[in-house]
Amino acid sequence: MTILLYDLVGADPARPFSPHCWKTALSLAHKGLDWQSVPTPFTSVPAVEGGFSKTIPVIRDGDALVADSFAIARYLEDTYPAQPTLFGGAGGVGGARFVERWSQLTIHPYLGTVALLDIHDRLAPADQAVATAGLEHWLSAVRAARSATRR
């Protein structure tokens, strides 16, 4: 059975851009599982699988629905133990969780500042309007920081 991965896309459905979805795609590929990307625009996320999660990635594996890239990796590890491991054992789970948390606290804020406007510009117009309404306060700070560095 093919596992469905709901994958965040912008105006071009062939170019998924979420690093969290990429982590899941890489996990599925590493496990050698049969999977298919379901291109999902920003405004369609709330409707994925009947509103199962506010965010993606989400996978559907038969009757199972799992959200969050780390939870998905744990699910894949537990459900497909005969496939290559993602963590290399219990110690690897803790190490992976540490790296995830560290990157969320130290790298993600910077990457968000650097990439947010580029991501916004690559969204479909309807998605841009919704994203702008929800992130205008953040976008204005990013615009100010960007223009200050480009003088």
Give residue spans per PLM region.
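A conserved mid-domain beta-alpha-beta active-site/ligand-binding segment of alpha/beta enzyme cores
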Residues: 125-151
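GST-like domain detector, emphasizing the conserved glutathione-binding G-site
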Residues: 1-129
